[in-house]
Amino acid sequence: NPFTQYRYNLERYVKETREAGATPILMSSIVRRKFNEHGTLEDTHGNYPLVVRMVARDLEVPFIDMQYLTERLERKFGPEKSESIHLHFEPGENPYYQNGKHDDTHLSYTGAKMIASLALQEIARQDLALENYIKHQVLEAEIVTLKD
């Protein structure tokens, strides 16, 4: 249940992180690639992302809305092109998946780079202290942009 044990665990992680002298940052989950027959991206996470938002607000923790950012990315790519973000391989196309793979949850190497880029861009946009540890050439590379 996102409103009980999940929320409790998030609050505990924030408390323990602060007690250790670190600064917590909460992120919502990335979306799954699930388009319906009309080409509309469907939510698959229920209330879990909402609870992360609530904990971030209530405990005044920096929050990165990866659900929103990745939803925009999936929509920008659309039902077909978004396969490249995930593990979609035909038999023999990838040595790790000789029999092929059609996985709309896990990311391809390309997708992982895109999602990491979005997270890093948001860290910089929010001017979080963590930005000091990001190489500027990584931010300047702008692997993916959500600008229209």
Predicted regions span which residues?
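Alpha-helical cap/lid subdomain in secreted, periplasmic
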Residues: 1-113, 117-135, 143-148
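Acidic helix/loop microenvironments that form the catalytic cleft of cell-wall polysaccharide enzymes
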Residues: 138
